[in-house]
A protein has these predicted regions:
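ATP/NTP phosphate-donor binding region
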Residues: 1-70, 267
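Accessory alpha-helical/coil subdomains and C-terminal extensions
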Residues: 2, 7-11, 28-38, 151-236, ...
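Short glycine/serine/threonine-rich phosphate/pyrophosphate-binding segments
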Residues: 15-16, 87-92, 122-126, 239-240
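Short acidic, glycine/serine/threonine-rich loops at helix termini
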Residues: 17-20, 92-93, 118-121, 151-157, ...
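Short Gly/Thr/Asp-enriched flexible loops that form oxyanion-binding sites at enzyme active sites
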Residues: 82-104, 241-249, 277
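Short, acidic/small-residue loops that bind anionic groups at enzyme active sites
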Residues: 92-121, 130-136, 253-263
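Internal gly/pro-rich beta-alpha loop/helix module
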Residues: 108-178
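ATP/nucleoside-binding phosphotransfer catalytic cores, i.e., glycine-rich phosphate-binding loops
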Residues: 241-331
Length: 331
């Protein structure tokens, strides 16, 4: 019988109604009591490192999860993390970069409704996660939700209330789960290196979302205070005329800053070579592109890069474009 470590962190799945709204209050042991069918499937040990609404999750919490998995890695066959849905995609992406080459599954799940309600998706999601974690072919960081298995770097929350809350962006679902049966769409990739854990992140990253007519007034402060700036642009990517000149001047003033372009559009990614607003600035400002990476993956990968990689731009560029847990297939 396989041994699975259950890591409860709060979220809607573990919430109860209070006069101020839903609040995480259900313990890890209580969560497990709602899915007795997994008792004969595996031997489960539960831990509860923190208990948060996922809107309050910060990078330090990701480091805590890495430490928990690292501490228990040799003692368990897999890991199931119960997490809130609002920042689940960020956590899954972050753990994909912080725990690499894991031959053991690290499954993240949650729910749109608390597990103690009569009508809820929580029981199925949690049960599916344990079945997936116990399967011999499972590995790496994945999200299991609404019967779908999504690579940790490809998930995006696309619905606020419906059970099918997450989509896999520009990449197939890895598998589907129905009635405890797993149908795999893609074979898992063999890892050539042993598992590696990274506990350091830098949160000195700013996401600049462009709007029509955006003012450049805050750009100097952003460039001064942040080590990396992710520009969430329109369409395939570019710098609009309203901020083009000051943006270029600041890039020249702060050549050590890491500038990355991503797109506000969910599907099909960026390509700054298409339009004049992108082509020239990409070269002049030495901008990296997200291509088909999600904003969640770009943000957390940048945090990981700043926390663990050399300061020179060439090394960071090479690491940024290296595929990790299916985060990019751009050629």
């Amino acid at each position: 019988m396989k041994k699975i470590l259950f890591i409860a962190t709060g979220g809607t799945i573990a919430s109860k109604k209070t006069e101020n709204g839903l609040t995480p209050q259900i313990t890890s042991e209580e969560l497990l009591s709602y899915i007795p069918e997994v008792e004969g499937l595996c031997e489960i040990t539960a831990v509860h490192p923190f208990n948060l609404d996922s809107s309050n999750v910060v990078p330090e919490n990701w480091s805590t999860l890495v430490k928990v998995v690292k501490e228990h890695y040799e003692d368990f066959d897999g890991f199931v993390i119960a997490h809130g849905t609002d920042t689940m995609a960020y956590t899954a992406a972050a753990l994909s970069y912080m725990i690499q080459n894991s031959e053991k599954p690290i499954v993240i799940t949650g729910a749109q409704r608390p597990i103690n309600l009569d009508i809820t998706d929580a029981k199925t999601n949690l049960s599916d996660s344990f079945y997936y974690a116990c399967d011999d072919a499972s590995q790496g960081v994945q999200i299991v939700f609404d019967g779908k298995v999504i690579a940790g770097t490809r998930a995006k929350k696309v619905r606020t209330k419906s059970y099918n809350a997450f989509s896999s962006i520009d990449f197939p679902y890895l598998a589907v789960i129905q009635d405890s049966r797993i149908l795999r769409y893609l074979p898992m990739l063999p890892y050539e290196k042993p598992v590696r854990f990274y506990e350091n992140l830098s949160d000195n990253v700013f996401l600049l979302k462009l709007i029509p007519g955006i003012s450049p007034v805050l750009l100097p402060a952003i460039f001064e205070h942040y080590d990396a700036i992710i520009v969430e642009s329109f369409g395939v990517g570019g710098i609009p005329a309203s901020i083009k000149e000051p943006f270029y001047e600041l890039c020249q003033k702060y050549p050590e800053k890491l500038i990355i372009m991503c797109t506000q559009v969910s599907h099909e990614g960026s390509d700054m070579t298409v339009y004049e607003v992108g082509h020239e600035m990409k070269t002049l400002c030495n901008i990296l592109e997200s291509y088909d990476m999600t904003p969640e993956a770009v943000t957390t990968k940048t945090m990981w890069l700043l926390g663990n990689r050399p300061d020179d731009h060439e090394s960071r560029e090479k690491a940024f474009y290296k595929p990790i847990n299916y985060d990019t297939v751009w050629k």
